[in-house]
Amino acid sequence: MGILYIVPTPVGNMEDMTMRAIRVLKEADMVLAEDTRTSSVLLKHFDIKNRLVAHHKFNEHGTSAGIVERLKAGETIALISDAGTPGISDPGFYLAREAAKAGITVQTLPGPTACIPAIVSSGLPCDRFCFEGFIPQKKGRQTYLESLKDEVRTMIFYESPYRVVKTLQQLSLIHISEPTRPEPIS
């Protein structure tokens, strides 16, 4: 059986790519990418010439079975996202789950992710925190935010820069955002 490698990619700085990640990408039989246009820039930068195949939220349910079959046949496949670690608010969870269910080794490399540097540099308590990922854009957004009202741990959200002000306003309306609870934005 092959191995599925989950390979983090730089979040804004190419120097954050590890030597191990470069080696895995060069040795893989195939590289799955959230956006092949974005990922081709990364691969070109590190002189990686492997086959690049789109694997994103719009096709992952349809392509995962075929990928699992390739892994069962012994191929080594690497999964990358546009930035950060695949599966963390990015495509990858479904494929990793299906591969693990099939008994395939899923190996995640350590590396870049946006949330950890953000919380560590925020000055907020980071000994215990909850990661909420992207807030729903429309359906259930207010209910979702209200469900977090009693959460006392530091919370991490991913949000579009175009919705940050709106989100902060919504958080203040349901008292998640108070003067005693700072809101660093990273």
Task: List PLM regions with ranges.
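Glycine-rich, flexible N-terminal cofactor/catalytic loop recognition
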Residues: 1-58
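Short glycine-rich anion-binding loops that position phosphate/pyrophosphate groups of nucleotides
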Residues: 11-13, 82-86, 161-163, 181
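Glycine-rich, highly charged phosphate/nucleotide-binding loops
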Residues: 59-67
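Glycine/small-residue-rich loop that forms an oxyanion/phosphate-binding "nest" at active or ligand-binding sites
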Residues: 67-113
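Class I SAM-dependent methyltransferase SAM-binding "motif I" and its flanking Rossmann-like core
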Residues: 94-151
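ATP/pyrophosphate-binding catalytic subdomain of soluble kinases
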Residues: 140-173, 177
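Single conserved hydrophobic/aromatic residue that forms the stacking wall/gate
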Residues: 174-186
